[in-house]
Amino acid sequence: MTKHILTLILLLALTTHITAQDATAHTPKYVFYFIGDGMGMNQVNGTETYLAAKEGRIGIKPLCFADFPHTAFATTFSSSHGITDSAAAGSALANGNKTYNGCIGLLPDSITPVSSIAVWAREAGAAVGISTSVSVDHATPAAFYAHRKNRNMYYEIGQDMCSSQFDFFAGSDFLKPERPGEASLYQQTQDAGYTIVRGYKEYQKKARKADRILMLQTEEASKNDRSALPYAIDRQKDDMTLVQITKAAIDFLRKKNPDRFFLMVEGGKIDWAGHNNDASTVYEEVIDMDNAVRVALDFYRKHPNETLIIVTADHETGGMGLGNKNYTLQFDLLQYQKMSTPQYSNHISRIVKQYGDSLTWEIIKQDLTANFGFWDKVKISQQQEEQLYKAYEDILAGRDKSQKTLYSQFNNLSYLAKSILNMNARIGWTSGSHTNGYVPVFAIGAGAHNIHGRIDNTDIPKIIAKVAGYRR
């Protein structure tokens, strides 16, 4: 009897070993590469803590990608700085080489171009998509198709996009679509064989007959802000979303090549909210990207042996600290913020214009209660109320001190409101810029076991290329 039991155990062990080998031996046909711009370790942990706090408990409520079975953490320094910018980090994630801050797709000599994993995928016969929640010519997406010594060369980067021969692009718009004496980037895009669609509904109408797609937000949305899609916390019903972009990309790339595709998806405004030190908005952006990852995860479940999903970040933004006093967190307070900091600034400007000299402190207090929970769900100190009142007086007197960050400008009242909420929730910040913190790497699917331990950001595209069979 003992002999039979031992034999059975050995057979089970052998079967498990063979199954594990089979699971790791597959070559992925479908590669998803998600990049959360500015999404460091604490942005992920903080979001999960926030989700649990909203349910009234201590702990975490996992994001789907944080439960992926294979994980690593990556260094992010550039060739020129201990703290990278998005151009150098995007280039490292795209082509596996370090370069200097501000550089897109070139070696540190600022001359030698380096092809990206998207190009390697295209040359291997895969359909290719590059997408983002910010502009299509911004640093991270540009790193996959452009070669420019300065990330601010937006018109030239747009020209590189047109000549890339990739199948699908998506983002808010072009930042600089026009140049005197030259064709607009819209015209150049169409001349290169792309069908421009505005919004998800128009994509659904026109995609079937299109050879290549450039998916942008509606013209009305771009008139309001062409630089990015609205923050998730500010989103209105008809706004284009990262989930819609991901769904459209999968649909179109499968149409182009049912057997093989590569898709990069960037959650670009995690970083922007980090520059603003706006925790509520950061966490809602991370949740928004997680929802896009869920779309890819649904695809993976239908093709588990043929799909690889990588989720990582280019750098951490803000030096987010999860705790600023004693051992207590009050992340549940963050749910009472209803707008991003810049959106609330615009909202206050409209109120000032509406009421003029008749704007009272009581009106402002009621608005702060409605949009931040102050004096109701969120208790604030006498000193904090005095700070807010002083900002109100400054607005009335026309001496408001506006605050400016990398991507935003807002009045002092909105700045103080989000700062007080962050402080009371027990969130700290060390910077209004990037930091040198490790970034997480999560992986699931064919070849995902190659993601483990401490790696560098330049290792990630090399690992993907190796397991997917792309020639570098």
For each of these PLM feature ranges, what is it?
Residues 29-30, 39-45, 49-91, 138-472:
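A post-motif C-terminal structural segment
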Residues 3, 15-16, 93, 122, ...:
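Solvent-exposed, well-ordered amphipathic alpha-helical segments
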Residues 7, 14, 32-34, 90, ...:
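N-terminal hydrophobic or amphipathic segments with adjacent small-residue motifs
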